[in-house]
Amino acid sequence: MSASTQGRRIVVVGAGVGGLAAAARLAHQGFDVQVFEKTQGPGGRCNRLQVDGFTWDLGPTIVLMPEVFEETFRAVGRRIEDYLTLLRCDPNYRVHFRDRSDVTFTSELCAMGRELERVEPGSYARYLAFLAQGRVQYRTSLDHLVGRNYAGLRDYLSPRVLARIFQVRAHRRMYADVSRFFQDERLRAAMTFQTMYLGVSPYASPAVYGLLPFTELGVGIWFPKGGLYAIPQALERLAREEGVRFHYGAPVERILTDGGRTRGVRLEGGEVVEADAVLCNADLPYAYEKLLDPKATTLKRKEKLRYTSSGYMLYLGMKRRYPELLHHNVVFGRDYKGSFDDIFEFRVPEDPSFYVNAPTRTDASLAPEGKDALYVLVPVPHQHPDLDWKVEGPKVRAKFFARMAELGFPSLESDIEVERRSSTPDDWAGTFNLARGSGFGLSQNFTQIGPFRPSNQDARVKNLFFVGASTQPGTGLPTVLISARLVTERLMTWAHAQGVSLSPRTAAATPLEGVAA
């Protein structure tokens, strides 16, 4: 070990969005950072498919809370505009109901008012009150709850924090809380389905997630030019500029521990890479089960952990464009509550709700001229012994096309030019090492948020840290970026306690030439 790197060597396991953002932040603070990733490129589940001129996002499809993305770049002395072009989606999305009615949601208040009054007379005034509550939930959560590390349960249960928890209505259930503002079941569904971004049911999730529809409608929905994969590309470029070294096609077989410390990692080929600390961006339950010696470390309540739902995905290259579709389209099944009950009781809904993404409405470069690259997400249960996705997958696919035919797209299946592949919970588990094929990581029910969620620092192995959707503060792209900030702060505290001497960069490095944004 050279004197220049003593105590500063960090190995990051995984090049997902959280690992990339944390690597850039740590390198900016003066750490010597290497990233090891099992696949051939960055992004994790925030990835893409490209075939014959069609481009599909593989996982996430929207950007919410742009201020969190801006802060990530600002923290290392950069401007997000030099790395990403964020395009606003407006109208935000259209929601289709089983009675063949629909509502187009927009951030433009007058237009939104007309849509709401058409469905439920008198609802616009209550909608404004709903947005006002959502703004309080949004700002309070970001500024006082989600955006900080907790020293422990006592810290979380302090009078100051408890007051904030009640202020954001985390003690209430989201569907019940939203029902105070809207009487029409269609609007109640349209204002609560956003919990599926987190893979949880609005009937079981805290009402604080009312911040999600506010974020969409009050702050806006955004889309990076080139698709969501532009985000990990930009973060990788940023990290490289800060001196981070990347090793792709390099699966980590084991995080090595000895005497209450980690000393690095062993790759599948047998090579040992020594480190002063390890930051794991692999899905946390998978890491504890597959990468760590259970005798050396512990994950409390592991057998009681609850997981989010998963998704059955279709990536369709179409022979033509469908002007009836917006960029974001949500289609509800007949029984809104029943579909959530089915998913979380490990049944595939008979009449599923689903989401259709048509990104050429915002970025025409994602498909050949006059054609559409459609992304379809059908929420389904995560892996379960009673579900065989070789059997269930084709059934879900057939239900999707049948429902689209009812909506006025009878030739959709015959219009397919390229069908790259479908993704099931089995694929999410196999490709991205997601425990149980759970597409969004650990659930964010009340018993798995705040300090009840697995910590970003192991309790026994003090130089082992975690970043990503299954650690604090939670799932979703902006939350994972906050996770990267929080674990950097936690790791900095650890390093200072060890007497590590750091020399943070005080000015932005010169951008690398020839590195794709």
From Swiss-Prot:
The keyword Flavoprotein applies. Its EC number is 1.3.99.29. It holds the Pfam family Amino_oxidase. Its cofactor is FAD. FAD binds at residues 11-44. Keywords: Carotenoid biosynthesis, FAD, Flavoprotein, NAD, Oxidoreductase. GO terms for biological process: carotenoid biosynthetic process. Pathway: Carotenoid biosynthesis; lycopene biosynthesis. One of its GO terms (molecular function) is oxidoreductase activity, acting on the CH-CH group of donors. It catalyses: 15-cis-phytoene + 2 A = all-trans-zeta-carotene + 2 AH2. InterPro entries: Amino_oxidase, Carotenoid/retinoid_OxRdtase, FAD/NAD-bd_sf, Phytoene_DH_bac_CS. It is an enzyme of class 1 (oxidoreductase). Belongs to the carotenoid/retinoid oxidoreductase family. This is zeta-carotene-forming phytoene desaturase. It comes from Myxococcus xanthus. The gene is carA2.
